[in-house]
Amino acid sequence: EVLSLNLKYLDNTLKVNFGPDRADIESTKAGETWETFRTTVDKIVNILSTNMNHRVVRLALCGSIIYSMDEDKSMQIYSKLAKIKNEQPVEWQLRKVLRTKLTTDDGTKSVIVNNVYQLTNTILIPGINTRDGVLLDMDVNTLVGTSADNILAVQGKFWTHASSVIDEAVVHYQS
């Protein structure tokens, strides 16, 4: 039997979901900065680590943004990415994963971080609005099996790195 616990603000702007092997912290607060979100995450993680006897064995920061556009603009983006002319797919997706190594200031501990980017064309409201969009999903995470001691040692650097990676991707893909 799998148990889960979900905590949330009444307005749903902050949710903490506990599953059998993870805790997800999700914010949908409009206009929130990464720094504010990170401060909230730090507080929640500190409360959890103080009150629960579990070590953090993996970190991840995810973000999504939809760029609304007409079908012609969506096809222009596809043509640039696929380098194929005169092709009109009804659905397309591009995914890439880059890796970064984060090391403590003294160089004694390090972790490998995946920077995952996925672009997908999408119809924003199927059946109602035929306007297209491009969905950018980003997932910055540590590798499964990384030492909990190493994760703890680079946790601050991870959050700074992950929020910077996502900010840079949002700016890059807007253009």
Features from the language model and the residues they span:
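N-terminal low-complexity, intrinsically disordered segments
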Residues: E1-T28
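Aromatic/basic-lined ligand-recognition segments
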Residues: N6, L59-D137
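Short, flexible beta-strand-to-coil junctions
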Residues: K8-L10, T28-A30, D139-G145
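Signature of extracytoplasmic/envelope-associated structural regions
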Residues: N12-T13, S49-N51, L81-A82, N86, ...
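Short, low-complexity cationic-aromatic patches
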Residues: L14-V16, E32, G127
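Aromatic- and glycine-enriched beta-alpha-beta binding-site module
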Residues: G19-Y67
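Short, conserved charged micro-motifs
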Residues: W34-T36, E71-S74, T146-A153
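Long, compositionally biased interface segments
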Residues: R131-S175
